[in-house]
Each structure stands twice: as structure tokens, then as C-alpha cells.
A protein has these predicted regions:
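Residue-level detection of the helix-turn-helix DNA-binding "recognition helix"
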Residues: 68-69
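N-terminal flexible/basic segments that precede or flank functional cores
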Residues: 1-42
Length: 96
């Protein structure tokens, strides 16, 4: 008898601002811009890509492209997306 599995979607588990912040903090530990762009896309899907697009004044398609592993969001896009998600960028000394 074969084991039946289904794809894991991180977006389904990002229900609270605390979960989202912890997820993005973990992604930032890898220091990988492509992974961060992808993770922001996952969070946008969890919160509703259409709503994030509307708040940022960008199309859903543009956000799907920008917030992917191949995307490279500009700083103004990054800041707008974070604001629409109810998040902000914070700077800390390395090792803090």
C-alpha cells in the first residue's frame, strides 16, 4: 500500500503576524536575496496576493513575478510590500 502525500504549502501555515515574522527572520538568516523574494511571495499568498497588490498599486502578475526566486524587487517595492503586509524592515548589528 503506497503512502499518499500532498504538497506542503508554507502559506497555509502563516496565520499570525508572529508566525510571519519568525518565518521571514529564519529566511533572512540564509542571507539569500532570491530566497527572501520567494518568502515574501509566500507571505503575500498567505495574506492574499490581490489585497497586497491593491495596497501597493501593482498588479498581481507583477507581484507574482517580483516576489519569486527569480524576482529582484526594488527597494521601493520591498518597502511597499512590507507595509501592505503590516511589517517593517529592522536593522540589527550582526551577531546581535
Amino acid at each position: 500500500m503506497a503512502l499518499e502525500t500532498r504538497p506542503y504549502d508554507t502559506a497555509e501555515h502563516l496565520k499570525t503576524p508572529e508566525h510571519i515574522a519568525a518565518y521571514l527572520d529564519a529566511v533572512l538568516e540564509d542571507n539569500d536575496p532570491a530566497l527572501l523574494a520567494h518568502a515574501l511571495g509566500v507571505v503575500a499568498r498567505a495574506q492574499g496576493m490581490a489585497e497586497i497588490a491593491q495596497e501597493t498599486g501593482r498588479s498581481r502578475e507583477q507581484l507574482y513575478r517580483t516576489l519569486s526566486e527569480k524576482g529582484n524587487p526594488q527597494l521601493d517595492t520591498l518597502m511597499g510590500v512590507l507595509k501592505a503586509m503590516g511589517l517593517r524592515l529592522s536593522i540589527q548589528p550582526v551577531g546581535a
